[in-house]
Curated annotation (Swiss-Prot):
This is UPF0316 protein BLi00691/BL01474. The keyword Transmembrane helix applies. It comes from the Bacteria. Its main location: membrane. GO terms for cellular component: plasma membrane. Keywords: Cell membrane, Membrane, Transmembrane, Transmembrane helix. The lineage of its organism: Bacteria, Bacillati, Bacillota, Bacilli, Bacillales.
Amino acid sequence: MLHSALLNGVIMVGIILVINIIYVTFLTLRMILTLKGQRYLAAFIGTIEMLVYVVGLGLVLDNLNQIQNVIAYAVGFGIGIIVGTKIEEKLALGYITVNAITKELDLDLPKQLREKGYGVTHWVVGGLEGDRTAMQILTPRKYELQLYETIKSIDSKAFIISYEPKTIHGGFWVKAVKKRRIKE
């Protein structure tokens, strides 16, 4: 009988842990999708999220006198955040804008990036040690690391900073970046 009760306790902890990992993964993805303007997909995920949440919370509240259930709920919450953000990183939704400034004036770098499929706007800027090339580059997030490596392979001392644009309207970027495939 003791063995059966212990087994049931372990199973309950496992169920609560898994349910909360699933719940918080959905919660994290829903929040990210909402921030990226994917409201319908976010609403669908939110519906599933709430179903899972109610079941998980119900199990914990029905067994609140068992501290291991509360701990499993809390640990599942933390793991769910990690899992959700890892999934979002793999999906790499949206675009990034990268601003890069070369160490020295290099008008060939924008051309090389365009040949690889990136949308590039460039201009000459004055730096402390002379003229440099500044570029603004739009790319899907899934190509972000590849873009950094490409820039660094051409100019290892380039200054690079990136951010996620909230809205993109008009110009070459909207039409061409969506159609283009970035070349290795």
